[in-house]
Each structure stands twice: as C-alpha cells, then as structure tokens.
C-alpha cells in the first residue's frame, strides 16, 4: 500500500489572554484582543503503522471533546484501537489534550494500543511541576504517566526508519521537529515553530515563545531545509492550508508555496 497523510481538522477557536479556547466558525472572527487559532492533528498511515502527530485539545476547550478526533479518524476508516503510534511536537494542552478523556466518568486512554513518543526531557519537566496548568490537567498528565505506553525520545532520535525527530526548542524548551520520509511521503511537522503557512515568509520573534530568537532561527532553517528536500510542511494551526510545500524562492516575494491535498491515494 502507498503511505498517506491527512489533517484532522478539529475546529477554529478564539483564544484570549486567559488561554481559554472558544469555538468559532472557520470563517469567523476572534473576540477583540484574542487570537484566531485552528487545530489540525495529523494522521499518517503506512503499511506497518497508523500514526498521529499531536492529538488536539480534547476536552480542555470550552465545549470540546475527543469525539471530534474519533469522528475524523472514522471518516478515514481508522478506529481508536488501530492507532499504533503518537508523536508529540511539544506538551501544550492544545496539542496533547486528545490523549485521554473522561467520557465514562474516569480517565481513559483515547488510543489504548498506541505507543506515545515524547521528548524525555520535556516529560521530566512536566512531571516535576507541582501543577500542570490546573488541577484537572495535572491529574491528566499523572494518568498518562501511569497508564500510557510512554517511549522517550532523545534530542536527536530515529525510532523508526521513516521517522526522525530533532530537538529544536524555541516555542517550548524541548520542542521537537518531526520528519517523516519514505518512498511516498516527505513530511516536516515543526509544531508551533512553523504553525501556519504564512510563517515561512515572516521573520519574527514571538513574545509567547519560550525562546523567541531560537524559534526565529529554527523557523528560517527548517523552512530552507524543507524547500531543499521538497518536504510537505504540516501546519498545525493553519485555518485554510494545513499541508503545503515550498516550490520556489523569489528575492522580492520570498518563498512561493502551494497547497498539498491529504488523504488516501
């Protein structure tokens, strides 16, 4: 079978300084002073594995739940028990919230058979905290620590022949870039370092990043490398074009990009 990748669009949200995620229409406007953010976990399927890259917000938004992620997977013929591996770019709750749920009144793994691949240093950082955001999220990560099939990644790691992970920092201290390469696909998922299509043509240092200058350096480097190797960039927070490729570079306009269609071949 041919390998394939698709975004699992989870919704668009208005996010204010309180970091609460309120659902809005895809073509709607964020509240005054808030950011408009879309969420797109990614599904990658090959002959041996069914892989998720990040898992959405789960129940940690206002009126959100893991059901949307399950429904998106079902549209592609995938059940929760068929997911073999989950790779996390970083451990912010809008990226990891779909890992577990309380639909039956107690915590359960959303993907019981999946190996959960996380940065070893990032997991140690989270577990060392007395509180992870709030009481509910602290309970959530403690449950994952006890019950998930955790597999820890070093700063430079290659858990499978087709998957390479590198520590890039920037947005968070131990943020990771995930490269996927086989005969059919060439992918880069850089989490919130390249979160949208437009960011490859913006040179900026964001105050919300752990290390804004590191994010800027890595964004420039990764965009250049993706262009050189012809990788499709997976943009987790893009509302319109979450998979795109850099096809050219113009001295005046910067990178020229084109959308990439996901889904089964």
Write out the residue ranges for each language-model feature:
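Core dinuclear metal-dependent hydrolase active-site scaffold
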Residues: 1-10, 41-45, 51, 155-183
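Zn-dependent metallo-beta-lactamase
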Residues: 1-48, 57, 221, 249, ...
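Residue-level marker for buried hydrophobic side chains located in beta-strands
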Residues: 51-53, 87, 116, 187-189
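Metallo-beta-lactamase
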Residues: 58, 74-75, 110-167, 214-230, ...
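Active-site metal-binding motif and surrounding structural segment of the metallo-beta-lactamase
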Residues: 65-117
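Histidine-centered divalent metal-coordination motifs
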Residues: 87-95, 171, 175, 237
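Short, electropositive alpha-helical surface patch
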Residues: 175, 243-262
């Amino acid at each position: 079978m041919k390998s394939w990748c698709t975004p699992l669009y989870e919704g668009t949200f208005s996010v204010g300084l309180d970091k609460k995620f309120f659902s809005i229409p895809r073509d709607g406007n964020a509240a005054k002073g808030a950011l408009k953010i879309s969420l797109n976990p990614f599904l990658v399927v090959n002959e041996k594995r069914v892989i998720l890259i990040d898992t959405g917000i789960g129940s940690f938004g206002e009126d959100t739940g893991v059901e949307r992620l399950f429904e998106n997977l079902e549209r592609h013929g995938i059940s929760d028990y068929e997911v073999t591996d989950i790779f996390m770019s970083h451990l912010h709750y809008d990226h990891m919230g779909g890992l577990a749920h309380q639909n039956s009144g107690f915590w359960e793994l959303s993907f019981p058979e999946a190996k959960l691949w996380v940065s070893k240093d990032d997991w140690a950082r989270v577990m060392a905290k007395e509180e992870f955001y709030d009481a509910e999220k602290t309970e959530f990560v403690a449950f994952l620590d006890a019950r998930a099939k955790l597999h820890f990644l070093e700063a430079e790691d290659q858990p499978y022949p087709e998957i390479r992970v590198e520590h890039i920092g920037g947005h968070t201290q131990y943020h990771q870039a995930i490269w996927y390469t086989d005969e059919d696909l060439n992918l880069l998922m850089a989490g919130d370092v390249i979160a949208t299509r437009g960011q490859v043509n913006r040179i900026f240092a964001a105050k919300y990043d752990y290390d804004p200058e590191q994010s800027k350096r890595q964004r420039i480097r990764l965009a250049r490398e993706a262009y050189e190797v012809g990788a499709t960039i997976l943009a987790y927070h893009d509302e319109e074009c979450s998979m795109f490729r850099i096809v050219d570079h113009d001295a005046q306009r910067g990178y020229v990009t084109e959308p990439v269609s996901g889904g089964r071949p």
